[in-house]
A protein has these predicted regions:
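Terminal and domain-boundary accessory regions
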Residues: 2-234
Length: 234
């Protein structure tokens, strides 16, 4: 970045005194190299998801279900776990695929959906906690997701850890732990454009790449229940 210092004569009075000159800094625009997968400024979903950063690697996938699900809904679509795992299987060698979800007691629809598509579902109960303004629904899964990811890092032989979440604080915490304990493991994030922290593609010291979810890994909102099991979806 360059700066040019220009001294300009100015007869305006500043703070009650006559200014003999005003120092003006003019900065030339800085050109930044983009990180692989950096989403477009518009926040729109690309047509295709670029998984080239996973090519041939042993990959462990961990997903923050609430984050990617809500992010996809904002884009008027649904995130497809089945399509993602199919694509990763073609590009790489998935070792584990875990999604952390929350569900009310007796509601196993989301769990069935994930397990029939090759994912392991870690189900946390939706709990009401007392707050200053009365009871509130508690659905934060960050601690459990971080713990499960730490277990994966300590017990599996992988080249890449793929975090499916746009939560910057969560992903940074996991990436720092991976850098401390498994420095050879590359940490890659996948998130929905418009619902992803800028840190995911700017912190090149922690993340090897960021993958912007494309429409090829989504389903329309008006999906239909499966004929064989009304609690699962096509």
């Amino acid at each position: 970045m360059t700066s040019r210092f220009l001294l300009q004569k100015n007869s305006r009075r500043l703070h009650g005194g006559l200014a003999k000159g005003v120092a003006v800094f003019r900065r030339t625009p800085k050109t930044c190299k983009t990180m692989p997968g950096e989403p477009a400024p518009s926040g729109q979903l690309p047509a295709a998801t670029d998984l080239s950063s996973l090519q041939g690697a042993r990959v462990a996938l961990v997903a923050d279900d609430e984050n990617v699900r809500i992010g996809a809904l904002r884009q008027q679509c649904r995130f497809s776990y089945g399509l993602l795992l199919d694509r990763v299987t073609k590009e790489a060698k998935p070792v584990a695929a875990i999604a952390v979800i929350t569900a009310a007691p007796g509601d196993d629809g989301r769990q069935n959906y994930l397990e029939t598509r090759g994912w392991q579902a870690l189900v946390l109960p939706r709990e009401q906690h007392a707050g200053a303004n009365g009871p509130r629904l508690y659905t934060n899964v960050d601690t459990d997701l971080g713990t499960e990811t730490g277990y994966l890092l300590g017990t599996t032989s992988i080249d890449v850890l793929l975090i499916c979440s746009g939560d910057g604080d969560l992903c940074l915490s996991i990436a720092r732990a991976a850098a401390r304990h498994r420095p050879k493991v590359r940490v890659v994030t996948l998130a929905v454009p418009g619902s992803a922290s800028h840190q995911l593609w700017r912190r090149r010291d922690l993340f090897a790449a960021h993958i912007a979810l494309g429409r090829d890994l989504t389903r329309p909102l008006n999906r239909q229940p499966s004929a064989s099991n009304p609690k699962t979806y096509v």
